[in-house]
């Protein structure tokens, strides 16, 4: 469910129920820190005009690795950094009852994982460009995820590439061992290998 009542006239798009092809912006606070499905009007996802045309489209959950590779390769560094919206939307896609697809329901035989990767500090959200206030919204999202029944069963890995708030990203990981600091882009492949190995280990021993 999308809403656009809090955007400027130039940014507003007609309210739609599902088939939105534009961009999404932060939800009204405090829902911007939550992955919960939209309910009341102020919790709805905001249909926003895309200010950067090169942004890659979100890829639904899939087992098609080639589709994932293609989508990843289509990404280009542009625009601002808003880790909080990526964090909450990522968790939302892993919910069985979300607007984003058909994830399996949480259960003893279902393991869910999310990797948050960033190469910079928060620079802009829907309201301002104050890094400290945006960091606070990300911190709120991470804290809420660790207590929410649906989200706390998701194992979250965070990866800081060269730049970013190290303490904040570490706190957003499920635990300190799932935070990785990469000082050069060439170090990403070994990190992803470690993460894959840890996921496979969980799958084999659970």
Locate predicted features.
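Terminal peptide-recognition signature
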Residues: 195
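Divalent-cation-coordinating short motifs within acidic/hydroxyl- or histidine-rich contexts, strongest
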Residues: 1-112, 116-117, 121-155, 167-170, ...
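Conserved residues at beta->alpha junctions
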Residues: 160, 182-183
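Short beta-strand/turn micro-motifs composed of small residues
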Residues: 118, 160-162
């Amino acid at each position: 469910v999308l809403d656009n009542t809090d955007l400027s006239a130039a940014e507003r798009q007609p309210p739609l129920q599902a088939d939105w092809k534009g961009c999404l912006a932060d939800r009204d606070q405090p829902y911007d820190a939550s992955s919960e499905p939209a309910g009341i009007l102020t919790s709805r996802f905001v249909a926003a005009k895309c200010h950067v045309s090169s942004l890659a489209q979100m890829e639904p959950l899939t087992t098609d690795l080639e589709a994932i590779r293609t989508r990843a390769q289509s990404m280009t560094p542009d625009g601002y950094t808003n880790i909080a919206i990526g964090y909450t939307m990522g968790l939302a896609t892993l919910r069985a009852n979300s607007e984003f697809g058909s994830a399996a329901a949480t259960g003893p035989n279902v393991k869910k994982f999310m990797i948050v990767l960033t190469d910079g500090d928060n620079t802009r959200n829907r309201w301002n460009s104050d890094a400290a206030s945006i960091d606070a919204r990300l911190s709120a999202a991470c804290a809420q995820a660790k207590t929410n029944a649906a989200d706390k069963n998701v194992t979250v890995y965070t990866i800081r590439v060269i730049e970013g708030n190290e303490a904040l990203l570490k706190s957003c990981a499920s635990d300190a061992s799932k935070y990785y600091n990469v000082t050069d882009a060439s170090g990403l492949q070994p990190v992803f290998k470690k993460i894959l190995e840890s996921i496979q280990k969980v799958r084999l021993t659970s």
